[in-house]
């Protein structure tokens, strides 16, 4: 039987040089040892596996079952029982050593090599006073970072494998009593129904299970911060962790989630309220400003003060393009510059961004391709987009920015209003895993008190009821 298994393995792996086959005899009982040398720790193999087998050879008595003796005498190593050939392949490709014992008994012993990096500072979601740890590519480490913060038995996780070839481990985390079970069950059903060659990152999985495929707005959040995940779980959200991916999915979400930062928890509620208002203002500026400028200079000049209109006209006197193409050219140039900024090493990207923007803007004005006021409009729009906490929302709204520009260049301010109606209608029609994307703004709900305006912590003593049925007090105190 063992010979058939080994021959089948050699055939399927094309007799790979990385798969090592060894034999060991204990009182004339043959043990076949199989492992993948690129995934297993050779020190553990020497110190635990081979040394333990040598010790077992000395103490073994024939009346005992060798299978049980091995399980009882190899310590400090996770041991799994193997029931079929598929288990052998799974454990072999996960850094386990396979022991094929006569009489059809088989064991898998975990001796995997540590191929992951250590816990580091967050790279994409920096905070001033937040936690300084981030997720890694190891799912056990990531779950540990969460459980270290949530010391409760009510933190439940359900594991599954996804991908015909990658067989990635996926863990779905919820807090019993807080999370809406319908959302969790819906996600699990979608994951179970997926038939795909492999999933290697959170972005791919997000698009596979999203309900809203006809909107450019994200209906889930990707994060690398354990503290952000814990805050979301305490609010009744569901979290998906993927092995070999340092980012975690949070769902469902509402539009307000894209304007919240972990630094908000450390700020005074008055200061933080002003900051949140500033973020929403920046959101409005980055979406509307180019379109309004184009509408005013193209169709509705009477709405501009005379001195300002004269200044605009003198600046644009040598520009051969309409305001729409002028703005579009600058935004395309900015997007190209930003994309190149992402693709080059960190030591060079800041210099390239600054020098590129200065040279490009000055050269464009001197050449008469764009006006100085357009450079200012594009700069304000781009800087305002950076204020938005979640970059996924910034990427989504740039398409609506172009629509507002088209509306402004065709029928002026009236076109801006038409696109605005389309924009708000689209937002109100989106749902994130069964929850309204625009809650608590539409419909208006009492939970709005922790959206744009942040109330004192003791006034925010209930959870969002559109996320969970358990709205018991989160924080309270008794006055003496």
Locations of regions flagged by a protein language model:
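Short aromatic-rich membrane-water interface segments that cap or initiate transmembrane helices
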Residues: 272, 311-322
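Membrane-interface interhelical connector segments
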Residues: 298-316
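Membrane-embedded alpha-helical signal segments
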Residues: 1-288, 292, 302, 306, ...
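Generic detector of multi-pass transmembrane helix bundles and their immediately adjacent loops
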Residues: 292, 305-308, 320-480
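Conserved helix-loop functional segments at active or binding sites
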Residues: 283, 287, 297, 314, ...
């Amino acid at each position: 039987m063992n010979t058939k298994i080994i021959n089948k393995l050699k055939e399927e792996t094309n007799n790979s040089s990385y798969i090592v086959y060894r034999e060991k005899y204990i009182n004339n009982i043959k043990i076949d040892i199989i492992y993948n040398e690129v995934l297993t720790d050779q020190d553990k193999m020497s110190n635990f596996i081979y040394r333990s087998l040598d010790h077992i050879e000395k103490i073994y008595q024939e009346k005992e079952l060798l299978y049980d003796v091995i399980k009882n005498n190899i310590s400090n190593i996770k041991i799994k029982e193997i029931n079929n050939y598929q288990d052998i392949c799974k454990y072999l490709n996960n850094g386990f050593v396979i022991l094929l014992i006569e009489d059809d008994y088989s064991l898998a012993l975990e001796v995997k090599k540590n191929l992951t990096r250590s816990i580091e500072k967050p790279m994409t979601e920096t905070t001033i006073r937040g936690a300084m740890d981030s997720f890694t590519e190891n799912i056990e480490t990531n779950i540990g970072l969460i459980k270290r913060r949530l010391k409760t038995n009510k933190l439940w996780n359900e594991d599954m494998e996804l991908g015909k070839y990658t067989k990635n481990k996926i863990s779905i985390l919820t807090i019993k009593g807080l999370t809406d079970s319908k959302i969790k069950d819906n996600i699990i059903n979608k994951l179970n129904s997926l038939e795909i060659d492999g999933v290697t990152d959170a972005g791919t999985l997000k698009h596979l299970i999203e309900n809203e495929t006809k909107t450019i707005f994200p209906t889930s959040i990707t994060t690398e911060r354990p503290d952000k995940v814990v805050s979301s779980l305490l609010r009744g959200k569901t979290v998906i962790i993927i092995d070999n991916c340092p980012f975690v999915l949070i769902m469902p979400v509402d539009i307000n989630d894209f304007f919240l930062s972990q630094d908000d928890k450390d700020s005074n509620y008055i200061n933080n309220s002003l900051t949140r208002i500033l973020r929403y203002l920046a959101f409005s500026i980055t979406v509307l400003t180019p379109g309004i400028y184009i509408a005013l200079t193209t169709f509705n000049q009477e709405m501009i003060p005379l001195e300002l209109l004269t200044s605009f006209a003198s600046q644009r006197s040598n520009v051969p393009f309409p305001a729409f193409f002028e703005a579009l050219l600058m935004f395309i140039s900015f997007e190209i510059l930003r994309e190149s900024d992402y693709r080059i090493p960190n030591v060079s990207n800041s210099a390239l961004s600054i020098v590129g923007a200065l040279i490009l803007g000055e050269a464009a004005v001197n050449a008469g391709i764009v006006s100085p006021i357009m450079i200012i409009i594009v700069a304000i729009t781009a800087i305002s987009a950076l204020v938005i906490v979640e970059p996924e929302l910034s990427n989504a709204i740039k398409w609506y920015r172009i629509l507002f520009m088209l509306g402004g260049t065709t029928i002026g301010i009236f076109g801006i209003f038409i696109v605005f109606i389309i924009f708000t209608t689209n937002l109100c029609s989106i749902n994130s895993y069964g929850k309204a994307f625009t809650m608590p703004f539409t419909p208006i709900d009492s939970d709005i008190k922790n959206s744009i305006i942040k109330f004192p912590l003791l006034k925010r003593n209930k959870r969002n009821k559109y996320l969970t049925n358990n709205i018991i007090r989160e924080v309270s105190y008794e006055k003496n």
